[in-house]
From Swiss-Prot:
It comes from Homo sapiens. It comes from the Eukaryota. Belongs to the TCP-1 chaperonin family. BBS12 subfamily. It holds the Pfam family Cpn60_TCP1. PANTHER family: BARDET-BIEDL SYNDROME 12 PROTEIN. It is found in: Cell projection, Cilium. It is linked to Bardet-Biedl syndrome 12: A syndrome characterized by usually severe pigmentary retinopathy, early-onset obesity, polydactyly, hypogenitalism, renal malformation and intellectual disability. Secondary features include diabetes mellitus, hypertension and congenital heart disease. Bardet-Biedl syndrome inheritance is autosomal recessive, but three mutated alleles (two at one locus, and a third at a second locus) may be required for clinical manifestation of some forms of the disease. Component of the chaperonin-containing T-complex (TRiC), a molecular chaperone complex that assists the folding of proteins upon ATP hydrolysis. As part of the TRiC complex may play a role in the assembly of BBSome, a complex involved in ciliogenesis regulating transports vesicles to the cilia. Involved in adipogenic differentiation. This is Chaperonin-containing T-complex member BBS12. The keyword Metal-binding does not apply. Adipocytes derived from BBS-patients' dermal fibroblasts in culture exhibit higher propensity for fat accumulation when compared to controls. This strongly suggests that a peripheral primary dysfunction of adipogenesis participates in the pathogenesis of obesity in BBS. The keyword Nucleotidyltransferase does not apply. Component of the chaperonin-containing T-complex (TRiC), a heterooligomeric complex of about 850 to 900 kDa that forms two stacked rings, 12 to 16 nm in diameter. Interacts with MKKS.
Length: 710
C-alpha cells in the first residue's frame, strides 16, 4: 500500500533518509490523542482504518533493507512490551535527522556512534531519579469487591500536556478518608507538603478555588504531614545535608535538595489511571481483570498467603463487532464464539456439568504430530464392501464419535483445526467441539478440570477426561449477541479456573482491531508496572530530564580541557580522544534535539498549541530554567510540587481534585530508546561502508535524486 513519496538525495546517506521518511508517517500516533489514518491500497483501492504504529507499518512497503530493519525493531518491541512503539518510531526519525546533521558538519562516524551511545546511557542513569515505587498495591484491597471506579477518573494527559479546558471531568465519589489515604504528597523547598493533584492547577484558577477547597486541603495536609520524607530509590536523594554534589561524567554536578517527599503509588486504581494515558475504557477493563485474578487467587490460596502476581498470560479477549460499546465487559472463565448451528447443543449442555477432552494438535484424519515418520510399504486391505463405500474421513469421524460416547464426553477443546465432518456429527449427537483454542486456555482447563492434554483422540482414556465444566451462553438472550459472521458468544468455566476474558465490542467493525490493540497496550503497561514495582513520573518529565541533562553536558564540554573531555571514554586512541573533545558538544546537542522534537510533537498533538514552533518555544523556556538551576531532576520535582506551576499544566478544567498523576512504564520506555538509537547507528555504519566505496564516485548527476515510496 502506498501512502506518500519523498525525494531522496543519493549523495547523502540514503538509509538515514529512508528512516526519517518512514518515521514521518507516524507522527500523529505520538501521545494520548492519536489521529487515525486511512490506508488506501493502490491496486484494489480498498481502505483500512489504523490508529497505531504497528498497524501502520503492516500497511507500508517495507521490502527495502532499511524497511526490514525498521520492521524488525518495531516487531521486537511490540512482541515483548506491546507499548513504546510510537516513541521508538519517532525517535528513529528524529535521531536519523540528527545524525545526518552531524555528518553534514563533518563529524566522524566513530565519534557519532561513541558519543550518542554514551549520551543515551547517561540519560538512562539520570532518569532513575524519576522512579516512583509501586509497592503494596494489593495489601489493602478488598478481595470481595469489584472495582468499577476507573471510569470516573479523567487523567492528566501529561505533565507538559493537559486536557483541553472544555473536557468534562467527572468527580470521583470517594469520602475524605479514602481520598486522603490515596493522595500522594511531596514537599517543596520549604518543607510544606502539597497534594499531588495541586500540581496541575493553573495560577489563574488557584485563587478562585482557594475557599471552596480549603477544608479538603486542610484534612489532606493534616494526614500527610505525619508521613516521613525518605527517598531510597534514587542516588540523588540519599544525602543527610541539604545540598550535595553528585559526581557525573565530565564533572557534571547534580545539586539536589534532601527535603523532597518520596513519590509513591500504592493504590491499583491510581496506578491504572496514571498508566491509561487517556484511554480510560480500556484500562478499566484491565483493572477489573486484575481484580478478578486477585479474587480467584485469594480463594485458591486462602487469605492470600503468597504474594499476588498479575498473570497476563491468563487474560484473553473476545471481539464482537457490531455490538454497542456498552456491552464490553470482563468475565471470569473463557468466552469464545461458535457457529449459531451450535445453539441447540449449548441449550442442551448449559444446565449440567460436562466432561471435557483436550487435544493438543489438529483434530483431523490426516494430522500427525511433529516428527512423525510414516511407515513405508504398508497397505490397508478392507474385506467389507460396506466399509469400502464410506470414505476414510467418514470412518475416522465415526471412530472419534464412538470414543466420545464411550467416555461420556460432551466438550472437546482443540488447539489446532477441526474436521468439518466431525463437527457436524458432534452437533447431531449434542456434543460441542471448539478449535483454535489458545495453549494457555488448554492448560488452565487441564489444571482446573483435571484433564490431561493428548495429541490424538485414540489416546483418550478415563484418566485424561476432565469434568465439572459449565457451558452456557454469554448473555441470557443469545440471539442478541450474534455477530456479523453469524456466530454466538459462549462462556466456558469451571470452579477455580484462572482465566479472565475481556469482551470487546464496537458498532463499527473497522475500529474493532484498534480497540483490541489499545486494550493490550493498557494491559501490558499495568503488567510491567506491577512486575517491576516501579514507574516513571510520566507525560514528558522523563524526556525533559534527558533533554536538560544533555544540554548541560554539552555546555560543560565546551568549557573543558581536551584531556578532561577524553576522560569520559577509556582505552581510546589519541586521535579519537582529541576528536572527541572537538565534536562531543555538537553530537550531544543533536542527540538532545531528538528529545526536543519529541516533546514539541507531543505538545502539538494535544491541540493545546497552534504549531510545533510554539510548543518548542514553551519547552525551550523551561529548558533554560532547568539548565540554569544546575539540577534538572530537582527542577522537575520542584515544579511538580508548586501549586501554580505551568510546566506541568496548560489550560485545564477547574475541576482540579479529579486529576491524578500520569505514569510511564520503565523498561519498555528505555528499551524503545535503545532500539531506536541502535537502529539508527546500525544504518549509519552500514551506509558508510557503501557510500564511501568505489561505486559512490561513479554516480551520474541525473541520478542524484530519486523517490522513496512508502
Amino acid at each position: 500500500m502506498v501512502m506518500a513519496c519523498r525525494v531522496v538525495n543519493k549523495r547523502r546517506h540514503m538509509g538515514l533518509q529512508q528512516l526519517s521518511s518512514f518515521a514521518e508517517t507516524g507522527r500523529t500516533f505520538l501521545g494520548p490523542l492519536k489521529s487515525s489514518k486511512f490506508i488506501i491500497d493502490e491496486e484494489c483501492h480498498e481502505s483500512v482504518l489504523i490508529s497505531s504504529t504497528v498497524r501502520l507499518l503492516e500497511s507500508l512497503d517495507l521490502t527495502s533493507a532499511v524497511g526490514q530493519l525498521l520492521n524488525e525493531a518495531v516487531q521486537a518491541q511490540n512482541n515483548t512490551y506491546r507499548t513504546g512503539i510510537s516513541t521508538l518510531l519517532f525517535l528513529v526519525g528524529a535521531w536519523s535527522s540528527a545524525v545526518e546533521e552531524c555528518l553534514h558538519l563533518g563529524v566522524p562516524i566513530s565519534i557519532i556512534v561513541s558519543v550518542m551511545s554514551e549520551g543515551l546511557n547517561f540519560c538512562s542513569e539520570e532518569v532513575v531519579s524519576l522512579h516512583v515505587p509501586v509497592h503494596n498495591i494489593f495489601d489493602c484491597m478488598d478481595s470481595t469487591k469489584t472495582f468499577s471506579q476507573l471510569e470516573t477518573f479523567s487523567v492528566s494527559l501529561c505533565p507538559f500536556l493537559q486536557v483541553p479546558s472544555d473536557t468534562d471531568l467527572i468527580e470521583e465519589l470517594h469520602g475524605l478518608k479514602d481520598v486522603a489515604s490515596q493522595t500522594l504528597t511531596i514537599s517543596n523547598l520549604s518543607g510544606r507538603p502539597l497534594k499531588s493533584y495541586e500540581l496541575f492547577k493553573p495560577q489563574t484558577k488557584v485563587e478562585a478555588d482557594n475557599n471552596t477547597s480549603r477544608t479538603l486541603k486542610n484534612s489532606l495536609l493534616a494526614d500527610t504531614c505525619c508521613r516521613q520524607s525518605i527517598l531510597i530509590h534514587s542516588r540523588h536523594f540519599n544525602r543527610t545535608d541539604n545540598t550535595e554534589g553528585v559526581s557525573k561524567p565530565d564533572g557534571f554536578q547534580e545539586h539536589v535538595t534532601a527535603t523532597h517527599k518520596t513519590y509513591r503509588c500504592n493504590d491499583l486504581v491510581e496506578l491504572a489511571v496514571g498508566l491509561s494515558h487517556g484511554d480510560h475504557s480500556s484500562m478499566k477493563l484491565v483493572e477489573e481483570a486484575v481484580q478478578l485474578q486477585y479474587q480467584n487467587a485469594c480463594v485458591q490460596q486462602g487469605n492470600c498467603t503468597k504474594p499476588f502476581m498479575f498473570d497476563i498470560s491468563r487474560i484473553f479477549t473476545c471481539c464482537l463487532p457490531g455490538l454497542p460499546e456498552t456491552s464490553s465487559c470482563v468475565c471470569p472463565g473463557y468466552i469464545t464464539v461458535v457457529s449459531v448451528s451450535n445453539n441447540p447443543v449449548i441449550k442442551e449442555l448449559q444446565n449440567q456439568p460436562v466432561r471435557i477432552v483436550l487435544i493438543e494438535g489438529d483434530l483431523t484424519e490426516n494430522y500427525r504430530h511433529l516428527g512423525f515418520n510414516k511407515s513405508a510399504n504398508i497397505k490397508t486391505v478392507l474385506d467389507s464392501m460396506r466399509l469400502q463405500e464410506d470414505s476414510s474421513e467418514e470412518l475416522w469421524a465415526n471412530h472419534v464419535l464412538q470414543v466420545l460416547i464411550q467416555f461420556k464426553v460432551n466438550l472437546v477443546l482443540v488447539q489446532g483445526n477441526v474436521s468439518e465432518r466431525l463437527i457436524e456429527k458432534c452437533i447431531n449427537s449434542k456434543r460441542l467441539v471448539i478449535g483454535s483454542v489458545n495453549g494457555s486456555v488448554m492448560q488452565a482447563f487441564a489444571e482446573a478440570a483435571g484433564a490431561v492434554q493428548v495429541a490424538y483422540i485414540t489416546q483418550v482414556n478415563e484418566d485424561c477426561v476432565g469434568d465439572g465444566v459449565c457451558v452456557t451462553f454469554w448473555r441470557s438472550s443469545p440471539l442478541d449477541v450474534v455477530d456479523r459472521n453469524n456466530r454466538i458468544a459462549i462462556l466456558l468455566k469451571t470452579e477455580g479456573i484462572n482465566l479472565v476474558t475481556a469482551v470487546l465490542t464496537n458498532p463499527v467493525t473497522a475500529q474493532m482491531q484498534i480497540k483490541e490493540d489499545r486494550f493490550w497496550t493498557c494491559a501490558y503497561r499495568l503488567y510491567y508496572a506491577l512486575k517491576e514495582e516501579k514507574v516513571f513520573l510520566g507525560g514528558g518529565a522523563v524526556e525533559f530530564l534527558c533533554l536538560s541533562c544533555l544540554h548541560i553536558l554539552a555546555e560543560q564540554s565546551l568549557k573543558k580541557e581536551n584531556h578532561a573531555c577524553s576522560g569520559w571514554l577509556h582505552n581510546t586512541s589519541s586521535w579519537l580522544a582529541s576528536s572527541l573533545a572537538i565534536y562531543r558538544p555538537t553530537v550531544l546537542k543533536f542527540l538532545a534535539n531528538g528529545w526536543q522534537k519529541y516533546l514539541s510533537t507531543l505538545l502539538y498533538n494535544t491541540a493545546n498549541y497552534s504549531s510545533e514552533f510554539e510548543a518548542s518555544t514553551y519547552i525551550q523556556h523551561h529548558l533554560q530554567n532547568a539548565t540554569d538551576s544546575g539540577s534538572p531532576s530537582s527542577y522537575i520535582l520542584n515544579e511538580y510540587s508548586k501549586l501554580n506551576s505551568r510546566i506541568f499544566n496548560s489550560d485545564i478544567s477547574n475541576k482540579l481534585e479529579q486529576i491524578p498523576r500520569v505514569y510511564d512504564v520503565v523498561t519498555p520506555k528505555i528499551e524503545a530508546w535503545r532500539r531506536a538509537l541502535d537502529l539508527v547507528l546500525l544504518v549509519l555504519q552500514t551506509d558508510s561502508e557503501i557510500i564511501t566505496g568505489h561505486g559512490h564516485t561513479q554516480i551520474n548527476s541525473q541520478e542524484l535524486t530519486g523517490f522513496l515510496f512508502l
